[in-house]
Amino acid sequence: MSYGFGNSTGQVAGAAFSALTKIDATAIPYKSTPQALTDLAGGQITFLFVDLASSAPHVKSGRLRMLAVTSEKPSALAPGLPSVASAAQLPGFDLAAWVGVLGPAGMPVDVTNRLSVAINQMLARTEVVERFAGMGSEAAPGDAAELERTMRTQLDVWGRKVREAGITPE
């Protein structure tokens, strides 16, 4: 059995899943996710953890089938799909990628606040929410303090997952 990955999120998810399920799966690194998707569709690898947007064309064409989402709970973006936590009976398995908007250290507070207001206004627009959903993402408005808390929490979570999976720097 083998799993492919074209980015660090896929690597950590695959390694964590293999370690937690005690599946002996060989990790196959790819330069990019599209190459891994092609090999998955062609049967060269057994499974792949990948974002919804990258996999959507292959799923729509019938070449690939989605099995579960990596968020702790099922996602509205993938109706009918269970979470890995429930499908594989792995309580607490929660590896959702996220993106934040960052600025340079020392950015004036008034600039940070203006950017935050503008970003939150944009994320509240229906067409933006729909566009994010079409890319397999959910908009999560907030402020700089919330993002900082999220980043600190996620650094701990991902650091623990990397250590649990036995991934070491190359």
Language-model segments: which ranges?
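Conserved, function-defining micro-sites of small-solute handling proteins
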Residues: M1-E170
